[in-house]
From Swiss-Prot:
Taxonomic classification: Eukaryota, Metazoa, Chordata, Craniata, Vertebrata
Localization (cell): Mitochondrion inner membrane
Record's protein name: Cytochrome b
Gene Ontology terms, MF aspect: metal ion binding; ubiquinol-cytochrome-c reductase activity
Function of the protein: Component of the ubiquinol-cytochrome c reductase complex (complex III or cytochrome b-c1 complex) that is part of the mitochondrial respiratory chain. The b-c1 complex mediates electron transfer from ubiquinol to cytochrome c. Contributes to the generation of a proton gradient across the mitochondrial membrane that is then used for ATP synthesis.
Any one annotated GO CC term: respiratory chain complex III
UniProt: a ubiquinone binding residues: H201
Keywords: Electron transport, Heme, Iron, Membrane, Metal-binding, Mitochondrion, Mitochondrion inner membrane, Respiratory chain, Transmembrane, Transmembrane helix, Transport, Ubiquinone
């Protein structure tokens, strides 16, 4: 009798994806983040589902329904903070996952990489819409400022913004549609994750050396299932520490004030995971230029496979490229810090310099360094 694991039409798909999957024997903990992202997505869908059972997407009651969840629903506060801080964990894992792909040259699997970029955009859109739902001050003004950026698009901009708003300002129609889309998009993300994995399993995983590992593979289970569980335990520890001890550490105190269209907060800023892009947006004095820079700051990832000039795939044996990679990391952290600061000197000039450095490093310095390393290898 054949093993049901290998013969059953549904079970054999799971088997070939998570159990008998041939995996390089030398992948490090940097390869844990894919599975952590899957768990984050499941956590967000589950906590979000239970929150949606008690939430009302009406401007008059949205803020108070969130208060009701935290005060009156059994463990409602836990659900709310798991969902809010779960989003932060999601983005930490996302950025580390993308960073791993950049460092080890995983972007040479172009289909997997491009689906990943589309996923990143979709997750960012979902998180932005989720931030609007509690209908606090920062929710309202964040929604107003960010959606208003689309008015910079020539000719159709104003019509587009009013179409998204469902009126002449951010109001009830906007909140209702954002709730509907915020509920729907995670399921679309889950479907796209399947496509992401489908393309990944066509080629197999990359590994830290960047050298094909066909001759040295091990089954995913038990080796990497155990390794992933360790990563999961560490992530859950960090998440629960945030939720139970510092639930508002990453939030904005302004969001504990109900939305008031007549009172603008002194510093409008998005959640921490968008601050780097927000800093790039603010560093350009022109509105359309800022919006283009904002979109390109992430869309630039698409051309990274074209900018790969080195004869080696991974940065493991390329010290000069490693220096640039960590410079880019430090630059992104600087941008994140600047995004949370008021628009005044010296923050303006620091933000402008950091934005220039960000694009220069990716488009100019990294390809040139790759060529130089090729030359040094021959020398």
């Amino acid at each position: 009798m054949t093993n049901i694991r290998k013969s059953h039409p549904l079970v054999k798909i799971i088997n070939s994806s998570f159990i008998d999957l041939p995996t390089p024997s030398n992948i490090s903990s940097w390869w844990n983040f894919g599975s952590l992202l899957g768990i984050c997505l499941m956590l967000q869908i589950l906590t979000g589902l239970f929150l949606a059972m008690h939430y009302t997407s009406d401007t008059t009651t949205a803020f108070y329904s969130v208060t009701h969840i935290c005060r009156d629903v059994n463990y409602g506060w836990t659900l709310r903070y798991l969902h809010a801080n779960g989003a932060s964990m999601f983005f930490i894992c996302l950025y580390l996952h993308v960073g791993r792909g950049l460092y080890y040259g995983s972007y040479t699997y172009t289909e997997t990489w491009n689906i990943g970029i589309i996923l990143l955009f979709t997750v960012m859109a979902t998180a932005f819409m989720g931030y609007v739902l509690p209908w606090g001050q920062m929710s309202f003004w964040g929604a107003t400022v960010i959606t208003n950026l689309l008015s910079a698009i020539p000719y159709i901009g104003t019509n587009l913004v009013e179409w998204i708003w469902g009126g002449f300002s951010v109001d009830k129609a906007t909140l209702t549609r954002f709730f509907a889309l915020h509920f729907l998009l995670p399921f679309i993300i889950a479907a796209m994750v399947m496509v992401h994995l489908l393309f990944l399993h066509e080629t197999g995983s990359n590994n830290p050396t960047g050298i094909p590992s066909n001759m040295d593979m091990i089954p995913f289970h038990p080796y990497y299932t155990i390794k992933d569980i360790l990563g999961l335990l560490l992530m859950i520890t960090v998440l629960l520490t945030l939720v139970l001890f510092f639930p508002d550490l990453l939030g904005d105190p302004d969001n504990y004030m109900p939305a008031n269209p007549l009172n603008t907060p002194p510093h409008i800023k998005p959640e921490w995971y968008f601050l780097f892009a927000y800093a790039i947006l603010r560093s350009i004095p022109n509105k359309l230029g800022g919006v283009l820079a904002l979109v390109l700051s992430i869309l630039i990832l698409i051309i990274i496979p074209l900018l790969h000039t080195s004869k080696q795939r991974s940065m493991t044996f390329r010290p000069l490229s490693q220096c640039l990679f960590w410079l880019l990391t430090a630059d992104l952290l600087t941008l994140t810090w600047i995004g949370g600061q008021p628009v005044e000197n010296p923050y303006i000039i620091i933000g402008q310099l950091a934005s220039i450095l960000y694009f220069t490093t990716i488009i100019v310095l990294m390809p040139l360094t790759g060529l130089m390393e090729n030359y040094l290898l021959k020398w």
